[in-house]
Amino acid sequence: MKVGAVIVAAGRGVRAGGGIPKQWRALHKGTVAQASIRAFTGHADIRDVVLVLHPDDIDTDLWPREPGLIVASGGASRSASVLAGLRMLNGKTDAVLIHDAARPCVTTRVIDDVISALRTAQAAAPAVAVVDALWTGENGQVTGTADRTGLYRAQTPQGFHLDAIIKAHRQFPEGAADDVEVARRAGLDVVIVPGDEDNLKITLPGDFARAEAILRARDGH
């Protein structure tokens, strides 16, 4: 099975601070996006890696010119950006892993598990079971509790057979929270593989320090 990856780095989110999109903020030995890219370009089972960029970023020095990296121009929505990346792999791979560039601490084990699941399933994605108590609330007040049984925190990379996820994105181009939702709308069954607590999505300013500590620990310093 030939496997490719699409790394989505076309967002403009600045909630994490710094005045520039979070994927281009400095982290460890490069940037947030660079750490994500290297997790896939350095993986033995991944054949082609596509980096989806915002059109304004393509002609800048923000993104790393990694050997063999394929660049795609993102669209007006996340779904359009993903589809642009998927099209770059059409005819090259059998399966694809779609990853948020803002998850720079993804592990080889998580990538391995998603690929392994795709050998027998059309779709697979990592997740971590919810263990905290869940409340509902309104106007700063607790209004109730929610049963956490069967609830998971979704992560990436989310993996699919390439033809199936391209068809799904064409059928359902808007409004999905992630690619698993797109796949399920199209009738695909999605296998859950174990996620990793370290596979955080950088969203808020404090997330950078945590990600830095994780990556430094892996390097042994």
Curated annotation (Swiss-Prot):
Its EC number is 2.7.7.60. One of its GO terms (molecular function) is 2-C-methyl-D-erythritol 4-phosphate cytidylyltransferase activity. The record marks 15, 22 as: Transition state stabilizer. The keyword Nucleotidyltransferase applies. It holds the Pfam family IspD. The record marks 148, 201 as: Positions MEP for the nucleophilic attack. Pathway: Isoprenoid biosynthesis; isopentenyl diphosphate biosynthesis via DXP pathway; isopentenyl diphosphate from 1-deoxy-D-xylulose 5-phosphate: step 2/6. One of its GO terms (biological process) is isopentenyl diphosphate biosynthetic process, methylerythritol 4-phosphate pathway. Keywords: Isoprene biosynthesis, Nucleotidyltransferase, Transferase. NCBIfam families: ispD (TIGR00453). This is 2-C-methyl-D-erythritol 4-phosphate cytidylyltransferase. The gene is ispD.
